[in-house]
From Swiss-Prot:
It is found in: Cytoplasm. Monomer. HAMAP family: Phosphoglyc_kinase (MF_00145). The gene is pgk. The keyword Nucleus does not apply. It catalyses: (2R)-3-phosphoglycerate + ATP = (2R)-3-phospho-glyceroyl phosphate + ADP. Keywords: ATP-binding, Cytoplasm, Glycolysis, Kinase, Nucleotide-binding, Transferase. GO terms for cellular component: cytosol. GO terms for molecular function: ADP binding; ATP binding; phosphoglycerate kinase activity. Signal peptide: none annotated. Substrate binds at residues 20-22, 35, 59-62, 136, 173. It comes from Treponema denticola (strain ATCC 35405 / DSM 14222 / CIP 103919 / JCM 8153 / KCTC 15104). It holds the Pfam family PGK. Its EC number is 2.7.2.3. This is Phosphoglycerate kinase.
């Protein structure tokens, strides 16, 4: 078990804490504060315990990569591009520090860099909070060279006696502020958000209450194959939806019309189906579809009542017969993990499958099942349908929760002290 902030004495200690404040920004204004609010319990606890100071660090997008993409798009559209204004509007932590200050009703000081801030840290009043600038303004943060990462990690380690990692969303990244820093601080513990994520995800991987159902959706088999393989070990049923379902249907010799499929992953999909059959895991693929002729929000929805899709159509969502199968399985499950939508829920006409899946998972939760929703799109879906609070746990880490469920060791967790 990893140690948390509750396992160490924080009184009069200087704390350096990695948070995940990678929030959507527009013109220097926070658009969604979910991730900031998620860190508040740990921040408040540290302050209540009488810490000497609290230094917070986070990335906020990837300034150089994002600016390069935005510049290319502007050039393509024949529009002017002001790189400095773009970065100031999207990647600066100062507005986040001000926003946090408003939530805490406490002053939050801001440092314009992650390097050379020791005097500023020392000058903080008792219980003072300092927010460092975006860690990714320093190339050392994400460097592939360990020695280069260590330059930033050593500097950051000077700001605290205790390192707290509460950024589950970046726990799968081996960066200077998420893992390397732990080599230069004697006490390394998890915050409450990190602890909560592990508490809910670990049983799904190692010892879930049976029957256990995994609902895996999204566009590509390639990005989900490792999690499918991993969940196969414990799942009683595997519901495969979204764009990736058509690769599996094609393997079974079904007609998929113009639907998305991955030629290169046909063999992988076939092996997975064979493995599931050997292990007695029930695989549920769509038996009917909501289709359209084009991939667009205004496309006309066409119900195809069979598994085979006509040549002129593409699958966009699951149909009512498929949802009836989902209902039977989901409502009889004791644990459920859901990663990825089962249709193009962003388009109103093709959102029913994902909405109904969310409602079924919520109903199973009410019946006592342990339910976890992870992955950006499925989280966005439960939020869209106002069902997030009806799930046992909605994970804050897209890639991190996926890698955790794949059974991978996450650097941001592996670097912490254990009991």
């Amino acid at each position: 078990m990893i140690k948390t902030v509750k396992d160490v004495n924080l009184k009069d200690k200087r704390i350096i804490m990695r948070v995940d404040f990678n929030v959507p920004m527009k013109d220097g204004v926070v658009q969604d504060d979910t991730r900031i609010r998620a860190a508040l319990p740990t921040i408040k606890y540290i302050l209540e315990q009488g810490a000497r100071s609290l230094v917070l660090m986070s990335h906020l997008g990837d300034p150089s990569k994002d600016a390069k993409k935005a510049k290319e798009k502007a050039e393509k559209d024949g529009k002017p591009f002001d790189e400095e204004a773009y970065i100031n509007g999207k990647h600066r932590m100062k507005p986040v520090a001000e926003y946090l200050s408003g939530l805490l009703k406490l002053p939050v000081d801001f440092a314009p860099s992650c390097m050379g801030q020791l005097e500023r840290v020392k000058a903080l009043p008792q219980g003072g909070i300092l927010m460092l600038e975006n860690t990714r303004f320093h190339k050392e943060e994400t460097s592939k060279e360990k020695a280069e990462q260590q330059i930033l990690a050593k500097e950051l380690s000077l700001y605290g006696d205790i390192y707290v990692n509460d950024a589950f969303g970046t726990a799968h990244r081996s960066h200077a502020s998420t893992a390397e820093i732990a080599n230069f601080v004697n006490t390394r513990v998890a915050g409450f958000l990190m602890e909560k994520e592990i508490k809910y995800l670990e049983p799904m991987l190692n010892n879930p209450a049976k029957p256990m159902t995994a609902i895996i959706g999204g566009a590509k088999v390639s990005s989900k194959i490792a999690v499918l393989e991993s969940l196969l070990k414990n799942a009683s049923s595997l519901i495969i939806g979204g764009g990736m379902a058509y690769t599996f249907l094609k393997v079974q010799g079904k007609k998929i019309g113009k639907s998305l499929f991955e030629e290169d992953f046909m063999d992988t999909a076939k092996n997975l189906l064979d493995k599931a059959e050997k292990q007695g895991v029930k695989i549920i693929l769509p038996v009917d579809h909501i289709c359209s002729e084009t991939f667009s929000p205004n496309a006309e929805a066409v119900l195809v009542e069979s598994t085979d899709i006509p040549d002129n159509l593409m699958g966009m969502d699951v149909g009512p017969k498929t949802l009836a199968l989902y209902k039977e399985i989901i409502l009889s499950s004791k644990s459920i993990v859901w990663n990825g939508p089962v249709g193009v829920f962003e388009f109103e006409a093709f959102s029913k499958g994902t909405e109904e899946t969310a409602r079924l998972v919520a109903a199973a939760t009410e019946k006592g099942a342990l339910t976890i929703v992870g992955g950006g799109d499925s989280v966005a879906a439960v939020n869209k349908f106002n069902l997030a609070d009806k799930m046992s746990h909605v994970s804050t880490g897209g890639g991190a929760s996926l890698e955790f469920l794949e059974g991978k060791v996450l650097p941001g967790i592996a670097c912490l002290d254990t009991i």
